[in-house]
């Protein structure tokens, strides 16, 4: 008799995605971040739902409602802290997931990679509108500065900004629609996650050595289910430690002050996980050029599969590419640091150099390393063939 999980229409799809899914037996802990992102998404939706029950999206009461949640709602402080710090962990997992995809050549599955980049954009938009909701100083001024960038679009920019604001400045209408967006976007994220998984499971996961593993696969359950549970345990440990001991570590002190349009903070900046893109934006003196650079810093991931020139899928056997990958990690860390610094020397020139290097690595160094490694491989192959002929 066929098991119900293999015959029932709904359970069959779940079974093929989580239980009987054939997975390469040699995938490492770097492949855990996909499941961790699912956990993060579920956690954010659950905590966000409870916060939405007590939050009011009006500029006169928004800040007070957040204070009310923390002071008067049972475990409200815990729910808010998990939601705020969970967003940071969400982006840590996303960036590590993207880094793994770059290193191990997962971008060669173009459909899954493109769906992943769209997912990244959706998550970034969700996080941005969510950052505005507490209506603190940095929330207000961050919303004003970032949304005002749309005015750089020729001809229609000013109209788009006013439409987004719901008036001539960031006000109650802006907060209401940002709350609506923040509530709705996660459903779009869920839909794109399913598309991402659909394309991923169509071809199967990559593996650390970058070769076809069809002849050597095992069931996802129980082996990788338990492996993922270990990742969940570590994730919970780090998140709860941060939430209970240093919950405000990754936040901005300015957000403890209610929004005041008459007082500008000395240094306006977004959350830490957007700082690398913000640094690239600030490195271009022209407003429209800065907006293009900001978008390009994310959308450049879409052309990574096109720029792949190596005969190897991943960087595991490519020493030159490994050096450039290390440079990229350091460069993003420098950009994140620069994004949190004031716009003054020497931070301006450091940011411009780091921004140039960021694009140069993707557009020149990675394709060049593949081409050089191919030439070295051909040279070694020819010399080996000649040696064999001589012998």
Curated annotation (Swiss-Prot):
Coiled coil residues, start to end: none
Spans through the membrane: 33-53, 77-98, 113-133, 178-198, 226-246, 288-308, 320-340, 347-367
Membrane topology annotation: Multi-pass membrane protein
Keyword Acyltransferase in record: no
Binding locations of heme b b562: 83, 182
UniProt cofactor note: Binds 2 heme b groups non-covalently.
Signal sequence bounds: none
A GO MF label: metal ion binding
Pfam families: Cytochrom_B_C, Cytochrome_B
InterPro entries in the cross-refs: Cyt_b/b6_C (IPR005798), Cyt_b/b6_C_sf (IPR036150), Cyt_b/b6_N (IPR005797), Cytb/b6-like_sf (IPR027387), Cytochrome_b (IPR030689), Cytochrome_b_C_euk/bac (IPR048260), Cytochrome_b_N_euk/bac (IPR048259), Di-haem_cyt_TM (IPR016174)
Keyword Heme: yes
Similarity remark: Belongs to the cytochrome b family.
Further comment found in the protein's record: Heme 1 (or BL or b562) is low-potential and absorbs at about 562 nm, and heme 2 (or BH or b566) is high-potential and absorbs at about 566 nm.
PANTHER family named in the record: CYTOCHROME B
Subunit architecture: The cytochrome bc1 complex contains 3 respiratory subunits (MT-CYB, CYC1 and UQCRFS1), 2 core proteins (UQCRC1 and UQCRC2) and probably 6 low-molecular weight proteins.
Name used for this protein in its record: Cytochrome b
Lineage: Eukaryota, Metazoa, Chordata, Craniata, Vertebrata
């Amino acid at each position: 008799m066929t098991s119900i999980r293999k015959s029932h229409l709904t359970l069959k799809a779940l079974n093929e995605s989580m239980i009987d899914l054939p997975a390469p037996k040699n995938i490492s802990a770097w492949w855990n971040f996909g499941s961790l992102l699912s956990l993060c998404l579920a956690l954010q939706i659950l905590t966000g739902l409870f916060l939405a029950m007590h939050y009011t999206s009006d500029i006169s009461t928004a800040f007070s409602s957040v204070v009310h949640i923390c002071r008067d709602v049972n475990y409200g402080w815990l729910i808010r802290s998990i939601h705020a710090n969970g967003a940071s962990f969400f982006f840590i997992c996303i960036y590590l997931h993207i880094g793994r995809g770059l290193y191990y050549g997962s971008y060669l599955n173009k459909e899954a990679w493109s769906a992943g980049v769209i997912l990244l954009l959706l998550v970034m938009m969700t996080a941005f509108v969510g950052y505005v909701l507490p209506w603190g100083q940095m929330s207000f001024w961050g919303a004003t500065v970032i949304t005002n960038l749309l005015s750089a679009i020729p001809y229609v920019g000013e109209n788009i900004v006013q439409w987004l604001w719901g008036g001539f400045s960031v006000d109650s209408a802006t907060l209401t629609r940002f709350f609506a967006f923040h509530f709705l976007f996660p459903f779009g994220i869920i839909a794109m996650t399913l598309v991402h998984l659909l394309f991923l499971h169509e071809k199967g996961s990559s593996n650390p050595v970058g070769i076809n593993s069809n002849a050597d696969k095992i069931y996802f359950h129980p082996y990788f289910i338990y492996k993922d549970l270990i990742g969940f345990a570590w994730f919970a440990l780090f998140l709860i430690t941060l939430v209970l001991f240093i919950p405000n570590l990754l936040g901005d002190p300015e957000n403890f002050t209610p929004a005041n349009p008459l007082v500008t903070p000395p240094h306006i900046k977004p959350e830490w996980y957007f700082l690398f893109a913000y640094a690239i934006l600030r490195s271009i003196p022209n407003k429209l050029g800065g907006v293009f650079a900001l978008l390009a810093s994310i959308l450049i991931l879409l052309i990574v599969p096109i720029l792949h020139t190596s005969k190897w899928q991943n960087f595991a056997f490519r020493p030159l590419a490994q050096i450039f990958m290390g440079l990229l990690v350091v460069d993003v860390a420098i950009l994140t640091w620069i994004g949190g610094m004031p716009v003054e020397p020497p931070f301006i020139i450091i940011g411009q150099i780091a921004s140039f290097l960021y694009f140069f690595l993707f557009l020149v160094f990675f394709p060049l390393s593949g081409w050089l490694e191919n030439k070295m491989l051909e040279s070694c192959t020819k010399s080996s063939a000649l040696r064999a002929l001589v012998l």
